[in-house]
């Protein structure tokens, strides 16, 4: 009887894992089911460009079915509960999907309501609607005080708020309002980026572009036109771009799979969910000490696929193909038609390469070829 493999989540981690499994396993060996709440896959890195009037949100969404290999069964429904003991996923319609192997790729969710006043008063670009609203706000912004704030780690794509700040500086210069605008970057960290070598690079760009910083600022609430920290410090604004706190998906919380923030404890090398058998996590949903972004999922998916395939075929997993070492390769826009790339893993974080136009062009090429590569599993 074929093994039942279920993937929960239709983001990049879920899509890649399902397609890799379908590519290497025959239908007589396994059935592969992907459960996705909306049936639409969104290229989330593109939201940054929507906010800055460089892309259209309609370009960023595609039908999930069109991105899956035909061997993958797609179930469009909300996963409400994962029963590890009974090995089944309960859906909103009341159906149960049983599994022998499970991949949890439910991502991260935005917890806007954890900060009083955040939803009502500030903007962010971590959703299609949010990016479009921010674009309109920037179009009408005529100067004074722009503030960009980030939540405590972890949150999705840590480079994105820094990229936005640098690109917003460029955007406002082109509009002729930068000379009457102060830009302030606010973070709970003691430096502008978690990796010291990257923080040093960003400090240089911020300094040359007269971008101010407020570090060790833990946002507690938003009062009118003021960000207020837990220590009572205040940062006034006319336009605030505040990235909401992140947490795990509701299905993770309801199933007792996550920690207090909903992140799933996993083995950092195998990505197996701790305390379970045959259950893995891919992408933002885990508690691993690495970046939450598409690159992470890209490198994790083949490792999980190899382990499941080996189990189905009754062999030992290939030690090279089945072990994740924390590798992340992340493009990083700095403005002026230039970008760099961040390359790091669990053990090393070398200084970023000198920003240049080649990396910027490579970033745009990747963005445009994304849809053609995700189905093949060659992303």
Q: Where is each model-derived feature located?
A:
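A Rossmann-like FAD-binding core segment of flavoenzymes
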Residues: 29-33, 72-85, 97, 173-265, ...
């Amino acid at each position: 009887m074929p093994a039942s493999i279920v993937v929960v989540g239709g983001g990049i981690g879920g899509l890649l894992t399902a397609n890799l499994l379908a590519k290497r396993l025959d239908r007589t060996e396994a059935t592969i089911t992907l459960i996705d709440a909306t049936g639409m896959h969104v290229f989330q890195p593109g939201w940054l460009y929507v906010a800055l009037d460089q892309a259209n949100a309609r370009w960023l969404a595609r039908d999930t079915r069109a991105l899956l290999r035909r061997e993958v069964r797609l179930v469009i429904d909300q996963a409400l509960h994962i029963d590890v003991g009974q090995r089944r996923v309960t859906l909103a319609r009341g159906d149960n999907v049983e599994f022998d192997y499970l991949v949890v790729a439910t991502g991260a969710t935005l917890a806007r309501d954890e900060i009083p006043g955040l939803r009502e008063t500030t903007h962010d670009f971590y959703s299609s609607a949010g990016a479009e609203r921010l674009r309109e706000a920037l179009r009408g912004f005529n100067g004074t005080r722009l503030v960009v704030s980030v939540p405590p780690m972890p949150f999705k794509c840590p480079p994105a708020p820094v990229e936005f700040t640098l690109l917003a500086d460029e955007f406002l210069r082109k509009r002729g309002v930068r000379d009457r605008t102060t830009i302030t970057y606010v973070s709970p960290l003691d430096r502008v980026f978690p990796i010291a070598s990257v923080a040093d690079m960003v400090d240089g760009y911020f300094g040359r572009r007269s971008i101010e910083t407020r570090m060790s600022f833990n946002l507690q609430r938003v009062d009118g036109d003021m960000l207020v920290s837990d220590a009572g410090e205040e940062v006034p604004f006319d336009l605030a771009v505040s990235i909401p706190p992140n947490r795990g998906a509701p299905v993770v919380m309801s199933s007792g799979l996550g920690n207090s923030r909903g992140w799933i404890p996993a083995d950092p090398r195998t990505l197996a969910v701790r305390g379970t058998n045959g259950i893995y996590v891919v992408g933002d949903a885990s508690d691993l000490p690495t970046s939450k972004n598409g690159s992470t999922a890209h490198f994790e998916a083949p490792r999980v696929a190899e382990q499941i395939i080996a189990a189905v075929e009754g062999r030992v997993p290939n030690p090279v193909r089945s072990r994740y070492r924390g590798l992340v390769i992340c493009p990083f826009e700095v403005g002026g038609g230039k970008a760099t790339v961040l390359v790091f893993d669990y053990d090393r974080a070398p200084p970023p390469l000198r920003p240049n136009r080649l990396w910027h062009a490579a970033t745009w090429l990747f963005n445009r070829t994304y849809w053609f590569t995700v189905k093949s599993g060659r992303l």
